[in-house]
């Protein structure tokens, strides 16, 4: 029987659970004295803020939610996408967080909007049960199309993510020193969400060498001087979203940049199994390489 992961309720260790419980007390107090908006909306928002609080307790060990920063929302969005939350759930939770932040005296207008956070409306059929992974041919089709329309950079970003399993923000943060490390050590050290540091193995240096040759010392690999990272992220996401018919094989499936991590996970897991590792051993390695350190996450990626 296939194991079912409850994406809305994950286990915490005792210390983190205590932090989360204290946050919930704070949240309930705020909503108990709040009369703004409809009751059902407040009820849904309270649930959304508690989901955010659980993430904040787990990833940042935050004792209160009075000082929400952009980095917290970027990490939270990545987490929700990793867990397979629908876009409607993500946007509602973000609205809940902004509502709550205003209630505790913060200014939600200073927080990044959904566009900056990379939240793009996708198909109504989006759900955790769908296999979000790209296929080999879809990746090649995308790279070819991107090159044909003068967006070779997008093709390189997609190929690199499929080879290394990097998040889009991690791809955009790469600089020449990362590439030098890859060429010398066959690995790249990545600082991911929540400050987690991991080593990602490099098995094919072809693209790495090309990017190294084309990147000036001290510069980012994919972000040109004067460019804003969040705009590059938004642009490639929209490019993928708007050109599905040019590279996707299944017209009823919505491919996203995040789906490249699913592609990496499935292929890397298969590769490790073929080298004699057990399923559990392979999952541990893949989970670590994806930057999760939580094996049950691979259930979502291997779907």
Regions found by a protein language model. Give the residues of each.
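N-terminal DNA-binding module of tyrosine recombinases/phage integrases
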Residues: 1-36
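N-terminal core-binding DNA-recognition domain of tyrosine recombinases/integrases
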Residues: 27-127
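Alpha-helix N-cap/helix-start motif at helix boundaries, enriched for small hydrophobics
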Residues: 97, 157-158, 169-174
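DNA breakage-rejoining catalytic core of tyrosine-based enzymes
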Residues: 123-141, 194-206, 217-219
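Basic, Lys/Arg- and aromatic-enriched nucleic-acid-binding interface segment
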Residues: 136-164, 168
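Conserved tyrosine-mediated DNA breakage-rejoining catalytic core shared by Y-recombinases
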Residues: 173-208
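Active-site/catalytic core of tyrosine-dependent DNA strand-transfer enzymes
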Residues: 203-271
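C-terminal catalytic core of tyrosine-transesterase DNA break-rejoin enzymes
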Residues: 261-296
């Amino acid at each position: 029987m296939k194991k079912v992961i409850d994406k809305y309720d994950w286990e915490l260790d005792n210390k983190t659970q205590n932090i989360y419980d204290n946050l919930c007390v704070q949240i309930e107090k705020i909503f108990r004295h709040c009369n703004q908006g409809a009751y059902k909306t407040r009820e849904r928002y309270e649930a959304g803020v508690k989901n955010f609080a659980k993430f904040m307790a787990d990833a940042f060990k935050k004792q209160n939610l009075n000082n929400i920063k952009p980095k917290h929302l970027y990490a939270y969005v990545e987490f929700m996408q990793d867990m397979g939350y629908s876009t409607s759930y993500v946007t509602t939770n973000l609205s809940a967080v902004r509502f709550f932040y205003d209630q505790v005296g913060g200014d939600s207008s200073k927080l990044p909007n959904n566009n900056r956070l990379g939240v793009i409306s996708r198909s109504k059929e989006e759900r955790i049960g769908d296999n979000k992974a790209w296929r080999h041919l879809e990746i090649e089709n995308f790279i070819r199309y991107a090159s044909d329309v003068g967006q070779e950079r997008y093709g390189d970003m997609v190929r690199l993510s499929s080879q290394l399993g990097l998040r889009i923000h991690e791809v955009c943060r790469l600089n020449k020193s990362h590439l030098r490390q890859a060429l010398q050590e066959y690995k790249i050290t990545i600082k991911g969400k929540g400050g987690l540091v991991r080593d990602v193995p490099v098995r094919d240096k072809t693209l790495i060498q090309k990017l190294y040759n084309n990147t000036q010392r001290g510069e980012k690999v994919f972000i040109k001087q004067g460019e804003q990272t969040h705009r590059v992220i938004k642009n490639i996401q929209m490019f993928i979203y708007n050109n599905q018919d040019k590279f996707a094989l299944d017209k009823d499936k919505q491919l996203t940049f995040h789906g490249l991590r699913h592609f990496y996970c499935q292929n890397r897991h298969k590769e490790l199994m073929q080298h004699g590792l057990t399923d559990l051993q392979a999952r541990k390695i893949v989970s670590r390489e994806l930057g999760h350190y939580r094996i049950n996450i691979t259930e979502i990626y291997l779907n």
